[in-house]
Structures are given as structure tokens and as C-alpha cells.
């Protein structure tokens, strides 16, 4: 190797070392286990997109399973307080902060297939709720269905008196309308609560069959009613975001937007497999007929107007926009 070639090789190595040493590593906190499908299907592509979009100047490190602090309910505050640079959570866990966002989860408001794109088409309507953080990703999920341990649910009468875990207040209103008792509980606690009989069932999408092993503790799965739909988000600490260059901020936001679509598509695909998996594990899948579903939907229908009236502001505009009215 000639002197000039050696010089180029050394110079290149020094530039690479300087770039790596100067990289900003951002922490992403998730309460879900490291075995969750979201790691390979969503987070790793997000990590790659951030690194690629910033030329390696910004990297993302995952902290799964509550490694930066236990409890899904505290996820939003971890981003606000800077414990994590990014945090994934559900707006329903801190519902008082996100009344407008949560209109998207009301029964029959979101189209399962187009919900995430519909949300982003009208994202300005939600922007005021994210003043304390930087919104990076927001997506709709698969419909929430009803897992039950012992009672096969085919009519609202079957729900009477049952203790049903719900992901949010709005989902709780639906359970109440059917005659059940809503129980607020993080997803990580459902398995033990159902196994021990603390709850009789749970409202959650069918990714939970495998992701949270509900196929092991529930015997019945009821679907076909107008369902609530739990939004997910990734939010970022404002100071961490502000500390990035304009170019790198744009790269993070672009990666987050891509992650929204990817997360939604992945959840829908895994949820579809979750129904089949439930049957394979010996569970009963109850697919309501049109007449059976109508009995549930008639009781749920007034919830939308009730919540819109309580929230006020532009809640009615959001519901109309998401419904395509």
C-alpha cells in the first residue's frame, strides 16, 4: 500500500470513529416484553430509519419490559420528564391528557383498514394535546374484542355482572352499556388477573392471544360488534427533540411517520393470526351474526354522542373527519 493510500485509510478510519463517538444515542422505553413482535417488526426498522436518515448522527437504543421503570401508565410521564427520550404507550392510560385523541377509539368511529392514515390526514386536530412532548408516531390498532375465561358471550345478557378489563374509560363505557363492570388494568396484568379470577374477561385486540398469552387463560373469544380501537403513540421528550439539528429532527419525524404505518399494518396482520391461534389452542371463537351484533351495537351507539358532548372543543369535527362525513 502506498503512502497516499495509507493516508486515506487512516483518515477514513478517523472520520468514522469521530462520527461514531459523536453520535447521539436516544433511549426508547417500552413496557412490553423484549419478545413482543413490535421489536423486530417496528422498532428495528425505526432504529434503522433514524440512523440512516441522520447519517449515523442519531441512534436509538431499546429498553424493553419496563427497564427504565415499571408500569405502562407511567410511560407518558417518562417522556415528559426525560427518563426516556422516546416512550411508547396508549393515550388511554393517561386519558385526561388526551380526550381528543381518544375520540378515535370510540365504537364505530375508526375504519380498521384506513384508521391510521385517516388520523394522520387530520393530525392538526389533535396537535394541542401534545404540547408537552413531541409526537413522533400515532396509529390505530386492531379492533378490541372480548376474551372471557368461563362465560361464552353471545348477547349483552351474557355480560351482565362480569368484571371486564378495559384499556380506557371509553371502552369502559361500552362494557357498562352492556351491563358489565369495567376494570381499569394495564395489559401486563391481564394474564394473572384472568387466571386467578380477579376478572372474568378482557377487552383487547387479538394480538394478545400470543403477545400476552391470553390464549392460555381464556376459553372464549367474542367478535363482530362495533368495537373500540386503542390508539398507540410514540412520544419524545421535548428537550431531546430540541437538541437535534433541523435535519435530524426531520429524519426522526419521517421515521416515526413510517413507523406509524408499519405498526398498524403489523398489528392487523398479527391480530388476524391471533384469532386462528386462539382456535388452534382449543378456544372457542364466537363470530356474532348480524342480528346478534346489532343487540350490542344498539347499546353502544349513544356512547359516541355522550363522549363528544363531554369533551367539547373540536371533538365533533374529529369524529366526522374520521368517519369520512
PLM regions with names:
Residues 19-23:
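Sec/Tat signal peptide C-region and signal peptidase I cleavage site
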Residues 1-11:
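Bacterial N-terminal signal peptides that target proteins for export
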Residues 12, 24-110, 128-325:
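N-terminal secretory/targeting leader peptides
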Residues 111-130:
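A gly/proline- and charged-residue-enriched helix-loop-helix capping module
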Amino acid at each position: 500500500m502506498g503512502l497516499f493510500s495509507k493516508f486515506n485509510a487512516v483518515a477514513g478510519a478517523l472520520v468514522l470513529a469521530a462520527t461514531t463517538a459523536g453520535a447521539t444515542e436516544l433511549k426508547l422505553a417500552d413496557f412490553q416484553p423484549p419478545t413482543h413482535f413490535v421489536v423486530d417488526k417496528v422498532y428495528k426498522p425505526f432504529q434503522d430509519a433514524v440512523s440512516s436518515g441522520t447519517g449515523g448522527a442519531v441512534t436509538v437504543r431499546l429498553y424493553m419490559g419496563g427497564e427504565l421503570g415499571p408500569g405502562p401508565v407511567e410511560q407518558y410521564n417518562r417522556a415528559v420528564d426525560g427518563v426516556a427520550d422516546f416512550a411508547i404507550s396508549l393515550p388511554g392510560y393517561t386519558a385526561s391528557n388526551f380526550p381528543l385523541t381518544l375520540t378515535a377509539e370510540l365504537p364505530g368511529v375508526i375504519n380498521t383498514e384506513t384508521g391510521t392514515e385517516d388520523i394522520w390526514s387530520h393530525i392538526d386536530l389533535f396537535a394541542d394535546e401534545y404540547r408537552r412532548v413531541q409526537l413522533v408516531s400515532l396509529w390505530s390498532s386492531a379492533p378490541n374484542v372480548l376474551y372471557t375465561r368461563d362465560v361464552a358471550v353471545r348477547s349483552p345478557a351474557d355480560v351482565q355482572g362480569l368484571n371486564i378489563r378495559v384499556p380506557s374509560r371509553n371502552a369502559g363505557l361500552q362494557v357498562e352499556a352492556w351491563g358489565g363492570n369495567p376494570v381499569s388494568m394495564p395489559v401486563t396484568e391481564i394474564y394473572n388477573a384472568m387466571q386467578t379470577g380477579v376478572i372474568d374477561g378482557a377487552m383487547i385486540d387479538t394480538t394478545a392471544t400470543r403477545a400476552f398469552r391470553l390464549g392460555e387463560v381464556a376459553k372464549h373469544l367474542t367478535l363482530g360488534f362495533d368495537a373500540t380501537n386503542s390508539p398507540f403513540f410514540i412520544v419524545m421528550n421535548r428537550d431531546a427533540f430540541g437538541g437535534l439539528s433541523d435535519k435530524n429532527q426531520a429524519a426522526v419525524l419521517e421515521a416515526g411517520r413510517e413507523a406509524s404505518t408499519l405498526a398498524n399494518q403489523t398489528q392487523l396482520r398479527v391480530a388476524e393470526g391471533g384469532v386462528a391461534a386462539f382456535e388452534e389452542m382449543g378456544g372457542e371463537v364466537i363470530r356474532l351474526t348480524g342480528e346478534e351484533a346489532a343487540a350490542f351495537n344498539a347499546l353502544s351507539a349513544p356512547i359516541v354522542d355522550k363522549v363528544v358532548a363531554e369533551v367539547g372543543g373540536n371533538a365533533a369535527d374529529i369524529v366526522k373527519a374520521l368517519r369520512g362525513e
